[in-house]
Amino acid sequence: MAVKIRLTRMGSKKKPFYRINVADSRSPRDGRFIETVGTYNPLVAENQVTLKEDRILEWLGNGAQPSDTVRNILSKEGVLKKFHDSKYSK
């Protein structure tokens, strides 16, 4: 089972709001998911993001692949740097 960390669209027409979900890669965009690990609101001035960093790091450690947009969000929040440092520090 290939697992992805990706965005699920919520909100209403012309006012999107996204949840950052862990889902099987074969599931549809707004379909079944395993766990919600954050939210992303692109409409506010500073693009409000909330993340469960410990859960995201655990999923990344287990091999989950983030989508391109989620990868950019995690990079801006510094989560990927923490993952890289924990993976390669010895």
Swiss-Prot record:
Assigned GO CC terms:
cytoplasm; small ribosomal subunit
Protein encoded by which gene: rpsP
Q: What are the recorded Gene Ontology BP terms? A: translation
Organism the protein comes from = Streptococcus sanguinis (strain SK36)
Q: Does the keyword Ribonucleoprotein apply?
A: yes
On whether Cell division is a keyword of this UniProt record, the answer is no
Q: Which GO terms describe its molecular function?
A: structural constituent of ribosome
Check the record and name the Gene3D superfamilies matching this protein.
3.30.1320.10
Protein name per UniProt: Small ribosomal subunit protein bS16
PANTHER family listed in its UniProt record: 30S RIBOSOMAL PROTEIN S16 (PTHR12919), SMALL RIBOSOMAL SUBUNIT PROTEIN BS16M (PTHR12919:SF20)
**What family is this?**
Belongs to the bacterial ribosomal protein bS16 family.
Matching entries from NCBIfam families are given as: S16 (TIGR00002)
Keyword terms, alphabetized: Ribonucleoprotein, Ribosomal protein
